[in-house]
A protein has these predicted regions:
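Accessory alpha-helical DNA-binding modules that contact the DNA backbone or grooves
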Residues: 2-205
Length: 205
């Protein structure tokens, strides 16, 4: 079975002399934008829409196995693509030039061809995978599946209001507001229709 750790005592007498109390950062160490604490109080996150670290993390998540499952698009390749100015957001992945990708360090023609083939294959993914891949706060795999089953297409979901969203089983007000804010945010690029190639396939409920 699993063991759940519990802190029962703080042994202050074992602390080294001169220990300074830890303070949570109030600004992102990468982009300098303010950070905020999540509703559960367990996490802090950067609010910078243009934060390079967030951009990399979002792209890696988008390509991950449980999301769009783009084989060969790991952190190192994502970093190379972003560093070369080829990719700023997920939609850019679907407009890559194979010859330019092949010029990247440790890439080559064959690897570039394989990568572009994997990206093309991801267009056939169902809507639930795409929704999870967007990395919208409060929208995990389960929520993505029920939303895809209910609305059936990305356009229908984007047009839904809070009342319609909260009528979906397991979708509460916080998740509904997170979805609406994400789709309406001027800082959030519109979902690329090439990436939404599987948008007509709701996926399993």
């Amino acid at each position: 079975g699993r063991f759940i750790p519990e802190i029962v005592e703080v042994l202050k007498d074992r602390r080294p002399e001169g220990t300074v109390p830890y303070r949570l950062p109030d600004h992102c160490p990468v982009c300098g934008a303010p950070v905020v604490r999540d509703e559960d109080g367990a996490h802090i996150r950067c609010t910078g829409a243009e934060c390079p670290a967030q951009r990399l993390r979002h792209l890696v998540h988008f390509a991950s196995r449980d999301a769009m499952d783009i084989e060969g698009l790991g952190p190192a390749v994502v970093e190379s693509l972003v560093g070369a100015g080829m990719v700023q957001g997920p939609g850019d992945l679907y407009h890559l030039d194979g010859e330019e990708v092949a010029k990247l360090e440790r890439m080559g023609k064959k690897s570039a061809e394989n990568l572009l083939a994997a990206i093309e294959k991801s267009k056939s993914n169902d809507l639930s995978r795409l929704l999870f891949a967007f990395g919208i706060r409060q929208v995990g795999q389960k929520a993505a599946k029920v939303l895809a089953a209910r609305f059936g297409s990305l356009d229908a979901l984007m047009a839904a209001g809070e009342e319609e969203l909260t009528a979906v089983p397991d979708i509460g007000g916080i998740t509904a507001q997170s979805l609406i804010s994400w789709f309406q945010s001027p800082q959030q690029p519109a979902p690329d229709r090439d990436a939404a190639g599987g948008g007509g396939q709701p996926g399993e409920p």
